[in-house]
């Protein structure tokens, strides 16, 4: 599973996942399924933000990666992937600037258009079950919840899906692709079932083979994130900024 993750996800996402697991004292060599789950969740958060900006009129617009409008404001602030101290600093700054109510738990994103925090969920189970678990944990109507599954299902607060259908289709296609690639390597069952994962761990099974280089497209506009095992597209300037911000070691 570890080899699969390193082949299938953007190196920055892998690095962020490693950092997150280290922060919580988890060993990715042992908790390989959690490593894969964290990388998947991070990628969905980044894809959620991809292409979405706010223009000078305060309207939400979708900008293609080749579009020269680099000075537009990103619609979503990405909170997930930062160390806890920095993440809470970002949340506090958003609350002070926008007047938003401070959440009890760290959310994944902030939507500047709708002025709300968003909790993203990616589940291997039934979406409604995971949604209820998230809602019971958060216990706040101020935080918007959006759940995706590997089967293409989704569920969101008050059926408000925030993004346009095409943007959500990119995310669903990517998740379905990850599932198919795991299944082709005999990893999917262990990813879904902890019992099966323990069996594979005891047997010392490792994923084999190189990732395929085929391309799956979702509608007209397709993020390179959907290239099955190639790094997801991100604006180069934003990538540099995020890397400096997310991976910066906190001062002791």
Curated annotation (Swiss-Prot):
GO terms for molecular function: RNA binding. This is Protein PA-X. One of its GO terms (biological process) is viral translational frameshifting. Plays a major role in the shutoff of the host protein expression by cleaving mRNAs probably via an endonuclease activity. This host shutoff allows the virus to escape from the host antiviral response. Hijacks host RNA splicing machinery to selectively target host RNAs containing introns for destruction. This may explain the preferential degradation of RNAs that have undergone co- or post-transcriptional processing. Pfam families: Flu_PA. The record marks 195, 198-199 as: Important for efficient shutoff activity and nuclear localization. The keyword Ligase does not apply. It is found in: Host cytoplasm; Host nucleus. Belongs to the influenza viruses PA-X family. The probable endonuclease active site in the N-terminus and the basic amino acid cluster in the C-terminus are important for the shutoff activity. The C-terminus acts as a nuclear localization signal. The C-terminus is recruited to host protein complexes involved in nuclear Pol II RNA processing. The keyword Zinc-finger does not apply. The active site is at 80, 108. Keywords: Decay of host mRNAs by virus, Eukaryotic host gene expression shutoff by virus, Host cytoplasm, Host gene expression shutoff by virus, Host mRNA suppression by virus, Host nucleus, Host-virus interaction. The record marks 202-203, 206 as: Important for efficient shutoff activity.
């Amino acid at each position: 599973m570890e080899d699969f993750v390193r082949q299938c996800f953007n190196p920055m996402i892998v690095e962020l996942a490693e950092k997150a697991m280290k922060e919580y004292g988890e060993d990715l060599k042992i908790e390989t399924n959690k490593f894969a789950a964290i990388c998947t969740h991070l990628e969905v958060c980044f894809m959620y933000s991809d292409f979405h900006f706010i223009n000078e009129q305060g309207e939400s617009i979708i900008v293609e990666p080749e579009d020269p409008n680099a000075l537009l404001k990103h619609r979503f602030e990405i909170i997930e992937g930062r160390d806890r101290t920095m993440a809470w600093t970002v949340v506090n700054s958003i609350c002070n600037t926008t007047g938003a109510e401070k959440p009890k738990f760290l959310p994944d994103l902030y939507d500047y258009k709708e002025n709300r925090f968003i909790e993203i969920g990616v589940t291997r189970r039934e979406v409604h079950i995971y949604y209820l678990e998230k809602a019971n944990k958060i216990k706040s109507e101020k935080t918007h919840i959006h759940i995706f599954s590997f089967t293409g299902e989704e569920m969101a607060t008050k059926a408000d899906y925030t993004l346009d259908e095409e943007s959500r289709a990119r995310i669903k296609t990517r998740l379905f692709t990850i599932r198919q690639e795991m299944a082709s390597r005999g990893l999917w069952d262990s990813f879904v079932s902890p019992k099966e994962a323990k069996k594979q761990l005891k047997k010392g099974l490792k994923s084999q083979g190189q990732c395929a280089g085929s391309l799956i497209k979702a509608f007209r506009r397709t993020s390179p994130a959907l290239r099955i095992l190639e790094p997801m597209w991100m604006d180069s300037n934003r990538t540099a900024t995020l890397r400096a911000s997310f991976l910066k070691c906190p001062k002791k």
